[in-house]
Regions:
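N-terminal secretory signal peptides and thylakoid transit peptides that target proteins
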Residues: 1-19
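Beta1-alpha1 glycine-rich phosphate/pyrophosphate-binding loop at the start
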Residues: 27-100
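SH3/SH3-like beta-barrel fold
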Residues: 116-118
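A conserved short coil-to-beta-strand element within the FAD-binding core of flavoproteins
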Residues: 104-113
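Core beta-strand elements of the Rossmann-like FAD/NAD(P) dinucleotide-binding domain
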Residues: 122-128
Length: 128
């Protein structure tokens, strides 16, 4: 199955709804891993963390340290803004919303084991 925007949004909504329910087993916070820190991934991470008020542990996997948005890029192309003005780092997500930002490539998702393997050799576990 290929992932498109509609599948991503419906999966994100399902994850948010499932994770918002009280935990029946265990005392740890639910784990959500989001792969990709573009406009969609960063926004999903932000709102899951914000709306859960810290009840969900959100990790964002993104190999680059900054993101250059296509929003307002026409202002750069027209000479009204410099290139750095359309760049964003992930520090605000980490500092303001408590999101764990991992700068690495996700190379495999094991849906049965609920883990995400990283290119650097580590792995992340998730709940839903």
């Amino acid at each position: 199955m290929t992932i498109n925007r509609r599948h991503f949004i419906s999966a994100s909504a399902g994850i948010t709804a499932a994770m918002s329910a009280p935990m029946v087993f265990g005392a740890s916070r639910p784990q959500v891993v989001i792969i990709g820190g573009g406009a969609g991934g960063a926004t999903a991470a932000r709102y899951i963390a914000k709306d859960s008020k810290g009840a969900i542990d959100v990790t964002l996997v993104e190999p680059t340290r900054s993101y250059y948005t296509c929003f307002f890029s026409n202002l750069y192309l027209g000479g009204f803004k410099d290139f750095d003005s359309i760049g964003h780092t992930y520090g605000k997500l980490a500092n303001d919303y408590g999101i764990n930002v991992v700068h690495d490539w996700a190379v495999d998702v094991d849906s049965n084991g609920k883990t995400v393997a990283l290119a650097g050799g580590g792995s992340l576990s998730y709940d839903k």
